[in-house]
Amino acid sequence: MLQSIKEASVQPALVIVYFGGNDSMHPHPSGIGPHVPLPEYIENMRKIALHLKSLSPTTRIIFLSSPPINEQQIKETLSGKFGRVNRTHEDCRVYSEACLQLCYEMDVNCIDLWTALQQRDDWLTTCFTDGIHFSPEASKIVVKEILKVLREAEWEPSLHWKSLSTEFSEDSLYDPIGPDAKTTINVSDMDVERHMQWE
């Protein structure tokens, strides 16, 4: 599959890679489960980065580090469903730091989700639905961090939404009505002063 992607005539402009949370779980005594030992996780992430870098000189890459978890919430919401949940906050930190270090060495943009989510004083109670999976509030933090990278990265062309040109601009009956009350105004390329949630 990876080879067919590499041979495709059109390569992705942006790839966001997010692994580490499940990998950081403790190994189950049965030998099954999602645990990936730290050295193997690092090597897998290195291979993913090298593959993505080989796709095209214009394919941009952002890795997301392993986020924190709320161990107490996991015990309260998931222990009855999955038995003993072998995941700790500290293990997530170790995998997060490993991802950040690898990305630094490979010159790949990486978002430190471990730190970003914990910037909120109430992160333990607002960032998760079950101690692991993101709530809408946590998802907003992730989007904000991704947009920050897109805005600040010195990529040519820039991939930040405000710098992208309008490719399919056309007049529409649904555009605002002009001052003459007979025509519409194409707002596709208007520079409007406003504050938007996703600046």
Regions found by a protein language model. Give the residues of each.
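Alpha-helical cap/lid subdomain in secreted, periplasmic
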Residues: 1-199
